C-alpha cells in the first residue's frame, strides 16, 4: 500500500513488485480510491477534489475491498492462497496495514516500511485546527508537482469519530501475527523514534534499520534506472527473507496485478 501523496506506480515501486513476483509471490499493488489519481491518469494528482476528500477510514475500506476482490475473483483461485495473505505498507500506509491486520483474520503477516506510529500527531491530521475549521479546508504544497493539495475538514472529523479504530499503538500491541519493521536511519519525514515505538509495542516484531536510507529508501520519482537503489534492494531482500522463513507453501510465480486498472 502506498503512502501519503503516493501512488502505486511512484518511483521504483514497479521494480519492487517485479522483485517480489520473481521471488515466487503473487503481488498486488493498487491506488487508494481518493489518492488524487484517476483510472485514466493514475500517476500524480489530476483529481485534487478526491484527494481533499480522502481519510484514514476510506483507506481501510479500500484495502478491505481489495482483499474481498481477491477472495471472490475466480481467476485467482489456482494462484492465491487466501488463507495466507501478507500486507506491506509504506509511510502512512504502514499504519493502515497494521490496523487492517489487527481487524482481519485473513492477514497472516505484515511489513511496515518507514511506517508511522500515531495518526494523531501527523500534520495532515491536525495542524492549525482553528483556521482549518474556520475555512473548511487547508492546503499542503506538493514539493515535487508544486500543486496546492486540499485537505477538507472532514479528514479531521473522520479521525475524531474513529479514534479508537485508528489507534495504531493499540493495534500493534494486539497484533498476533509476525511483523517486520523496516526504517531508514536518515528518514526525516517519519523519524526513527516512530519505528522504535512500534518495536516497543510489539516485542515479538523483527526490527531492521537500513543505514543511509531516507524516507523512500533512496529512490525517487521518476525512477528511470533498471535497478533499485542499494537501500531499497536491502528492503526487498530483507522482506523476502522474512516472508520465506514464515510461509510454508508458495503461490504461482511471476504474478503482478494493478487492480486499480481492472474492472
Feature-to-residue mapping (PLM):
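Short, surface-exposed "cap/lid" segments of acyl-processing enzymes
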Residues: 1-36
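Short beta-strand/loop motif that positions the catalytic acidic residue
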Residues: 174-176, 181-183, 187
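Alpha/beta-hydrolase fold nucleophile elbow
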Residues: 76-90
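Short alpha-helix in the alpha/beta-hydrolase fold that links the catalytic acid
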Residues: 13, 177, 190-200, 222
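Catalytic active-site module of serine/aspartate enzymes centered on a nucleophile-bearing elbow/loop
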Residues: 213-263
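Alpha/beta-hydrolase active-site loop
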Residues: 49-78
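Hydrolase active-site cap/lid region
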Residues: 103-154
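Acidic catalytic loop of the alpha/beta-hydrolase fold
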Residues: 186-190, 215
Amino acid at each position: 500500500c502506498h503512502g501519503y501523496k503516493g501512488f502505486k506506480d511512484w518511483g521504483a515501486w514497479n521494480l519492487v513488485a517485479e522483485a517480489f513476483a520473481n521471488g515466487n509471490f503473487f503481488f498486488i499493488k493498487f491506488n487508494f480510491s481518493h489518492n488524487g489519481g484517476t483510472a485514466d491518469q493514475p500517476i500524480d494528482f489530476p483529481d485534487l477534489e478526491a484527494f481533499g476528500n480522502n481519510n484514514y477510514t476510506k483507506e481501510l475500506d479500500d484495502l478491505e475491498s481489495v482483499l474481498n476482490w481477491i477472495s471472490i475473483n475466480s481467476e485467482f483461485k489456482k494462484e492465491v492462497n487466501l488463507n495466507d495473505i501478507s500486507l506491506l505498507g509504506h509511510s502512512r500506509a504502514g499504519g493502515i496495514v497494521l490496523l487492517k491486520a489487527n481487524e482481519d483474520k485473513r492477514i497472516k503477516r505484515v511489513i511496515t516500511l518507514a511506517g508511522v506510529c500515531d495518526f494523531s500527531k501527523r500534520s495532515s491530521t491536525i495542524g492549525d485546527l482553528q483556521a482549518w475549521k474556520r475555512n473548511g479546508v487547508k492546503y499542503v504544497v506538493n514539493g515535487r508537482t508544486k500543486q496546492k493539495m486540499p485537505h477538507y475538514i472532514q479528514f479531521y472529523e473522520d479521525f475524531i469519530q474513529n479514534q479508537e479504530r485508528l489507534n495504531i499503538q493499540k493495534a500493534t500491541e494486539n497484533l498476533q501475527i509476525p511483523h517486520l519493521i523496516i526504517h531508514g536511519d536518515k528518514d526525516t519525514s517519519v523519524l526513527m523514534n516512530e519505528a522504535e515505538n512500534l518495536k516497543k509495542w510489539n516485542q515479538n516484531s523483527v526490527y531492521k534499520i537500513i543505514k543511509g536510507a531516507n524516507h523512500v529508501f533512496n529512490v525517487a520519482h521518476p525512477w528511470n534506472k533498471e535497478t533499485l537503489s542499494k537501500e531499497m534492494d536491502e528492503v526487498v531482500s530483507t522482506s523476502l527473507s522474512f516472508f520465506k522463513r514464515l510461509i510454508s507453501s508458495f503461490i504461482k510465480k511471476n504474478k503482478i496485478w494493478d487492480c486499480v486498472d481492472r474492472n
